[in-house]
């Protein structure tokens, strides 16, 4: 009986315990409700000041999707992964090599959401103080704005250079008097020597050709102009000319043979002009390229190193002749005379330390000299809306890399094919391009030489400014020349590269 009672009591207690434990179940945790997708893009920063040297910073972006960002070319964007409608965006700003501050508004966009903007303001590069002027800047001021006697003594027919074979009249004293009167300070006289060079090992230059070149240089000297004299279409562009870079790169023995001819030719030229004053400068080559490769596609350093060797041969040959050549200014280009390959150019060892770097600029090709002959250029047009920034960045980089380090640089050729004055829009943008490039060159202390091939009219290859025989303006060229000389000579505080930019023609 007692056992039965005890068992019943035990069962009751067990049931009571179970009832107490199970009678009230804990409520389950509620399922979290996801945050709704934002209807507007928001940024952790909406403005940022950046030093001229450039830099990077992060922005936290609230957005329904990874944002698309509208930005200028000098700003780059890197997005992280999107988590809970949040992404970290890394913003990188390139160095500002220009003398003017710049501002950009970045627009962050995402489908289905209102966009947001971030304004970046970057400081200008520091201008050299007047007391910081170095020899490179002083040399730029000496050469200043120059003019090319193009397609003249450099003209060539059937392998023989001839002054008038490309349609220009013979140069006269009036030619250079006119150039001087137009406002130019210097002239570059391109000369092709091929067809007038004898056999190895002397490689004797014909007296008649040498004397004609000497006479033309004398015209410029009498007019009070500084002169650059070079070897021009002796270069090979797939035409089997004697300055055959491709053969030299591909065959060491051929390279040595060509270097001997370079030394012989430049020794003769230097001896002919050794008593000329400091107004005369000698330039080694024009636009050396490998075969027909205007853009070197492979073994770039090897190709450029051969040019470096040739430039050293040139400097050594000229300096060895003595006289005024011991201290005369010399100029050397790199591959294709292109600024894109200057990083491969080695400044030759020069005991006088008076060697300048040369480059040419016809940027952008499709606007200046290419077949497209686009109707406009720059921020106010429809083509190359970043054109001004590209020119400033190029010249600013050259200034910082060379000129600020006391290595003088000059732009041996620049220009743009003439546009028809009857097309008011095309004409106004043509003048604007010339003005902007010339003012930029002056701003960055780069002496600049306008390419003039004597071709009259408008359209591709029409670069006639000063008549090569009379020295008078060609067609409508006076307006273009006046724009150039104003850009170079007007140093008033109210006329800067920025004011030129702000006066761009309207499309």
Where are these regions (language model features)?
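Surface-exposed binding patches on compact interaction domains or structured appendages
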Residues: 43, 62-90
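A short beta-strand micro-motif common to beta-rich folds, especially ectodomain repeats
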Residues: 89, 99-112
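Aromatic-rich peripheral "rim/lid" segments of glycoside hydrolase catalytic domains that contact
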Residues: 421-507
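N-terminal carbohydrate-binding accessory modules
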Residues: 126-186
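An active-site-proximal structural segment forming one wall of the substrate-binding cleft
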Residues: 167-187, 202-233, 237-284, 306-322
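Bacterial Sec-dependent N-terminal signal peptides
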Residues: 18-44, 117-131
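Active-site region of glycoside hydrolase catalytic domains
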Residues: 256-387, 396-417, 443-446
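Solvent-exposed, low-complexity, repeat-rich "mucin-like" stalks and linkers
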Residues: 39-69
